[in-house]
From Swiss-Prot:
Source species taxonomy: Eukaryota, Metazoa, Chordata, Craniata, Vertebrata
InterPro entries: F-box-assoc_dom, F-box-like_dom_sf, F-box_dom, F-box_only, Galactose-bd-like_sf
Subunit structure: Part of a SCF (SKP1-cullin-F-box) protein ligase complex. Interacts with VCP, CHEK1 and CUL1.
Protein's name in the database: F-box only protein 6
Keyword Phosphoprotein: yes
CDD domains: F-box_FBXO6-like
Length: 265
């Protein structure tokens, strides 16, 4: 019985096989095999089908996608890159930059003179004191699975969100700083709005802060996230701003027209 080359299979059968091969293996191991495999693996239809199969889009998806291959990888990597954002593990994963007053503390929602959080799944928050309290994380994008060409050529949006609230019976000041940095930690882009001061006898409402980094310079390899604050009345205890549910998420920008070629991840 004569052996049959896999390349003699109809292209639709080969595409079905490729549908079940992990995406990184497709680019690293399968795409270099021959011109036929390269051309099939570069087909938009393959990556769109993989997106459908993984649940990244639905059949009625109507938003424009300029590069389905990039879209697939960004969807597969999409998650909150900050660890322990809602204080479920006390202060784990956070670097304490300033620990003034009676220092950082974790409390359960809604807290004294506080209000419930909009998302009922969030149960805890970090709270500051009467002198400056700041905490931070540094995200290593390469360690999180984002390779250089994906970041430099396609420059996906980097969406930063944070939530803060005062106590109703005490004024406070809240601040946030987020920086995109190079491999050697040179700052390439930053978000650092003026501190927010809330007066005593407020509604203790939770407020969302949001910023999207787009079209930033190439070379981003790290993200520095820092937030915190203090109360304005210098009261002993934990009367400063409360923070929780912070997030840094990298997402595909569907309206962008990036270069077509993408190197192996």
């Amino acid at each position: 019985m004569a052996l049959v080359s896999i390349n003699q299979l109809p292209e639709n059968i080969l595409l079905e096989v490729f549908m079940h091969v992990p995406a990184r293996q497709l680019l690293r191991n399968c795409r270099p095999v021959c011109c036929l495999w390269r051309d099939l693996i570069d087909l938009v239809s393959l990556w769109k089908r993989k997106c459908l199969r993984e649940g990244y889009v639905t059949e009625d998806w109507d938003q424009p996608v300029s590069d389905w291959k990039v879209f697939y990888f960004l969807c597969s990597l999409r998650r909150n890159l900050l660890r322990n954002p809602c204080a479920e593990e006390d202060m784990k994963s956070w670097k304490i930059d300033s620990n003034g007053g009676d220092q950082w503390k974790v409390e359960s929602l809604p807290g004294a003179h506080g209000t419930g959080f909009p998302d009922s799944k969030v149960k805890k928050y970090f709270v500051t004191s009467y002198d400056m309290c700041l905490k931070s994380q540094i995200i290593d994008l390469k360690a999180e699975g984002y390779w250089e060409e994906l970041l430099d050529k396609f420059r996906p949006d980097i969406v930063v969100k944070d939530w803060f609230a005062p106590r109703a019976d005490c004024g406070c000041t809240y601040q946030i700083r987020v920086q995109l940095a190079s491999a050697d930690y040179l700052v390439l882009a930053s978000f650092e709005p003026p501190p927010v001061t809330i007066h005593q006898w407020n509604d203790a409402k939770w407020t969302e802060v949001s910023h999207t980094f787009s079209d930033y310079p190439p070379g981003v390899r790290h993200i520095f996230f820092q937030h915190g604050g203090k109360d304005t009345q210098f009261w002993a205890g934990w009367y400063g701003p409360r923070v929780t549910n912070s997030s840094v998420v990298i997402s595909h920008r569907v309206t962008r027209n990036p270069p077509h070629a993408m190197a192996q991840p």
